[in-house]
Amino acid sequence: MSSATEAHVRTLSNGQEIPLLALGMWQVPDGPTAENAVRWALELGYRHIDTAQVYGNETSVGRALAQSGVPRDQLFVTTKFNPSRKDPAAELARNLQRLGLEYVDLYLIHWPQRGPTWAWPGMEHALELGYTRSIGLSNFSVNELDQLLTLSSVPPMVNQVQFSPLAYRRALLEASQARGIVVEAYSPLGTGRNQFASNPAHCRI
């Protein structure tokens, strides 16, 4: 990574560094739109690309990464387990095929469907197999975090949640920090539905 990129990272509990800024691929159509989004982001200096099985664009993301010329060790790739499926490790193996990668840097449970704990052993297994460098969660509450932590051999490194000035979840942030879990925000500037851009204070910032 460049010195500018290295200055904008957080260190996870396992020592891995995660770039603070990522390109999120939610609602980006598969095909040329997704490929161009990734390509242009990498040209602008982004090194963290965040996708998911349910986004349906992993193949295009992988194609753009392969064509970018950016060395793999300078990229940080996140994907997510769809908890309507059964086996996190097997699903990640399929994700890797679509992405054209040997591993991802971060693998998250996309949401706590069917309870917060059942999928975690499979996430730990994916880590043991070398399919991912780090594992974590998305959209988990404090109570769900604590249920999982009582049963986990490897604690989650990340909890990715909606977090913005209009959705400032202080209790979740403080509880996660106390447990050594990095909170990663999606929609950090809000979404079109919450009229973030119409707030004068936000516009001044």
Outline where the language-model segments fall:
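Short, acidic/polar
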Residues: 29-42, 85-100, 116-118, 143-146, ...
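N-terminal binding-site loop/beta-alpha segment at the start of enzyme catalytic domains
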Residues: 1-75, 89, 189-192
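CE4/NodB-like, metal-dependent polysaccharide N-deacetylase domain
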Residues: 88-109, 125-129, 150-151, 181
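Generic structural signal for well-ordered alpha-helices
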Residues: 7, 38, 58, 62-65, ...
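Conserved, mostly hydrophobic/aromatic
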Residues: 23, 41, 49, 61, ...
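Short, well-ordered coil/turn segments that N-cap beta-strands
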Residues: 16-21, 45-48, 70-75, 101-105, ...
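Beta/alpha (TIM)-barrel catalytic core signal, keyed to glycine-rich beta->alpha loops juxtaposed to Asp/Glu
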Residues: 112-205
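A short, structured active-site edge motif that brings together acidic residues
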Residues: 72-85, 105-112, 139-142
